């Protein structure tokens, strides 16, 4: 049996529940919503950043708030595709760095092979093309 690294999101859901304005049972939150809340925590982002990561525009921030409260579900193939890519990015970064602080530093530093762009800036632009660019770059770093 091979080595299995610890989960990059251990206990994140419980931590996020404490930070929500009103208590939400994790049973009411779908897996994708739990994942995005965990990702925001890991990457030290605010809930408003989820709007861009998921491909919504600013006018839909109320909808995202309702999703985080468990009152609405995250619908649409685009958002689910983005979640899939974000999961792959997070998984590859965790595999490569094994340290959340180093991972966060890397995400916020200009990367020469991305033409000096900052990966987090690309992710927060809201473009699926930019998310894919960051994913491909990170996966090439880890040899996937």
What feature does the model see in each segment?
Residues 1-144:
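Non-transmembrane "mature" sequence context
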């Amino acid at each position: 049996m091979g080595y299995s690294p610890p989960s990059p999101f251990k206990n994140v859901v419980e931590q996020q529940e404490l930070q929500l304005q009103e208590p939400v049972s994790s049973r009411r939150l779908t897996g994708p919503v739990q994942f995005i809340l965990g990702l925001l925590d890991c990457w030290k982002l605010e809930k408003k950043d989820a709007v861009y990561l998921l491909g919504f525009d600013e006018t839909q921030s109320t909808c995202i708030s309702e999703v985080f409260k468990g009152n609405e579900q995250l619908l649409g193939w685009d958002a689910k595709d983005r979640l899939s890519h974000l999961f792959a990015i997070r998984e590859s970064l965790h595999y490569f760095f094994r340290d959340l602080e180093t991972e966060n530093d890397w995400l916020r530093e200009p990367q020469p092979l991305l033409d000096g762009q900052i990966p987090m800036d690309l992710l927060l632009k809201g473009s699926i093309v930019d998310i894919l660019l960051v994913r491909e770059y990170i996966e090439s770093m880890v040899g996937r």
